[in-house]
């Protein structure tokens, strides 16, 4: 009898569900996946090498472009590594602002994930709902940094500036009447902090809407339950982190286990799954959005009561004020040195990790005492998750591969870097 060969199929990189530039070579028996071979490197931009030729502060915007839906959290890992080597203290207000924006970024990421994941599986409505809320948070990004995506807001020693007192408002146009305009600007009449507070007050109801559409939906459960199961032991061996390992029942979260900034002062829970399948990972991420709301509310309350500096007063690391520069020669010299040569970081090596929306995002930084990193190694969570795809997809249908890629929450900016 003739031997039947397995069928080989290329999935991506021009595939709408490939999340960027993923190329999978699938070995199929009928429609069942026997092997999934991910081919990466199509979005490689040599970020680590570029960082070796730029001063420490010039590399902050490169971090935004790694995982381009979780911009500020990438910056956070990088500035933490620099601060560790410099041994500088970050003002308390700056730490709270960082934590607040980490959680805003987490919500931004999970909204993008739930919208794209649902769209891949075939649910169109959730995508539109999620982007309605993302728009408000993008406006917050724009209000503090001037950019909707690549903010470059965090700095070694603090943040670029304090939260502005006024929130940008919608302007009158031909397509909006007075009443519609007044309604749109209702929440924007106060400060940026007021706007964030208003957003997180109404956000839990929005999460309820997503859950109404998906959680008990028959088709959603048929597509997710029992798909891509990873046991707790295997999750540890594969190096999974973030919602991927928590979905398998392991309560590992750097915000609790290795607290950084002010996370040890905040009250929140770690959602954990039971079965380790796509459905549990979905539930974990939805609950994470609720926990981020809790954290953000606590940060807002603290920030209202405690004004103060938002960046270190060490002018060898952070620029002096404009007023100081115009009156004080020393400040002018500091400013000039900072933006031409940059600051020198003491010799040594360090690893700083943050709880990124996708998992553990780590920066391994080696300094030889110069004004540039000697070596910068990025530990991207998606890289470990993608390497587990072959194991997770075996024995499933082609359509389930799309579900598994969606549940891994893959963004190629950080995998290929």
Swiss-Prot record:
Localization annotation: Cell inner membrane
Sample GO molecular function, one term: NAD binding
Stated family: Belongs to the complex I 49 kDa subunit family.
Record's keyword terms, sorted: Cell inner membrane, Cell membrane, Membrane, NAD, Quinone, Translocase, Transport, Ubiquinone
Pfam families (UniProt xref): Complex1_49kDa (PF00346)
Catalysis: reaction(s): a quinone + NADH + 5 H(+)(in) = a quinol + NAD(+) + 4 H(+)(out)
PANTHER family: NADH DEHYDROGENASE [UBIQUINONE] IRON-SULFUR PROTEIN 2, MITOCHONDRIAL, NADH-UBIQUINONE OXIDOREDUCTASE 49 KDA SUBUNIT
Protein name: NADH-quinone oxidoreductase subunit D
Name of the encoding gene: nuoD
Gene Ontology CC: plasma membrane
Function: NDH-1 shuttles electrons from NADH, via FMN and iron-sulfur (Fe-S) centers, to quinones in the respiratory chain. The immediate electron acceptor for the enzyme in this species is believed to be ubiquinone. Couples the redox reaction to proton translocation (for every two electrons transferred, four hydrogen ions are translocated across the cytoplasmic membrane), and thus conserves the redox energy in a proton gradient.
PROSITE patterns according to UniProt: COMPLEX1_49K
Transport found in the keyword field: yes
Protein EC: 7.1.1.-
Topology of this chain in the membrane: Peripheral membrane protein
InterPro entries xrefs: NADH_Q_OxRdtase_suD (IPR001135), NADH_UbQ_OxRdtase_49kDa_CS (IPR014029), NDH1_su_D/H (IPR022885), NiFe-Hase_large (IPR029014)
Subunit structure and binding partners: NDH-1 is composed of 14 different subunits. Subunits NuoB, C, D, E, F, and G constitute the peripheral sector of the complex.
Lineage summary: Bacteria, Pseudomonadati, Pseudomonadota, Betaproteobacteria, Burkholderiales
Main enzyme class: translocase
């Amino acid at each position: 009898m003739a031997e039947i060969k397995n069928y080989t199929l290329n999935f991506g990189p021009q595939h709408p569900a490939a999340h960027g530039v993923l190329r999978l070579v699938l070995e199929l028996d009928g429609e069942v996946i026997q092997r999934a071979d991910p081919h990466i490197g199509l979005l490689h931009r040599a970020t680590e090498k570029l960082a070796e030729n730029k001063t420490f502060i010039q590399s902050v915007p490169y971090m935004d472009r790694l995982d381009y839906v979780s911009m500020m959290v990438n910056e956070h890992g990088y500035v933490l590594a620099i601060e560790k080597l410099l041994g500088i203290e970050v003002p308390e207000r700056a730490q709270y602002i960082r934590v607040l924006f980490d959680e805003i970024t987490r919500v931004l990421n999970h909204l993008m994930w739930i919208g794209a994941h649902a769209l891949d599986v075939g649910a169109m409505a959730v995508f539109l709902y999620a982007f309605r809320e993302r728009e408000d948070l993008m406006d917050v990004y724009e209000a503090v940094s001037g950019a909707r995506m690549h903010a470059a807001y965090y700095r070694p020693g603090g943040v670029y500036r304090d939260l502005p007192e006024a929130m940008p408002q919608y302007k009158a146009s031909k397509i909006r009447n007075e009443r519609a305009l007044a309604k749109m600007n209702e929440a924007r009449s106060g400060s940026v902090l007021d706007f964030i507070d208003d957003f997180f007050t109404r956000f839990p109801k929005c999460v309820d809407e997503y859950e109404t559409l998906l959680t008990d939906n028959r088709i959603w459960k048929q597509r997710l339950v029992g798909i891509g199961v990873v046991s707790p032991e295997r999750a540890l061996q594969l190096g999974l982190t973030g919602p991927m390992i928590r979905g398998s029942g392991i309560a590992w979260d750097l915000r609790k286990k290795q607290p950084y900034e002010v996370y040890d002062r905040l009250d929140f829970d770690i959602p954990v799954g039971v079965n380790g399948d796509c459905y549990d990972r979905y539930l974990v991420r939805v609950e994470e959005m609720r926990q981020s709301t809790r954290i953000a509310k606590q940060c807002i309350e603290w920030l209202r009561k405690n004004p103060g500096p938002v960046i270190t007063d060490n002018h060898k690391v952070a620029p002096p004020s404009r007023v100081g520069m115009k009156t004080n020669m020393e400040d002018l010299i500091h400013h000039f040195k900072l933006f031409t040569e940059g600051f020198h970081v003491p010799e040594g090596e360090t690893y700083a990790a943050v709880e990124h929306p996708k998992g553990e995002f780590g920066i391994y930084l080696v300094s030889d005492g110069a004004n540039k990193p000697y070596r910068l190694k990025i530990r991207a969570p998606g890289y470990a998750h993608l390497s587990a795809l072959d194991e997770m997809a075996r024995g499933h249908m082609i359509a389930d591969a799309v579900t598994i890629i969606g549940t891994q929450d893959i963004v190629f900016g950080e995998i290929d870097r």
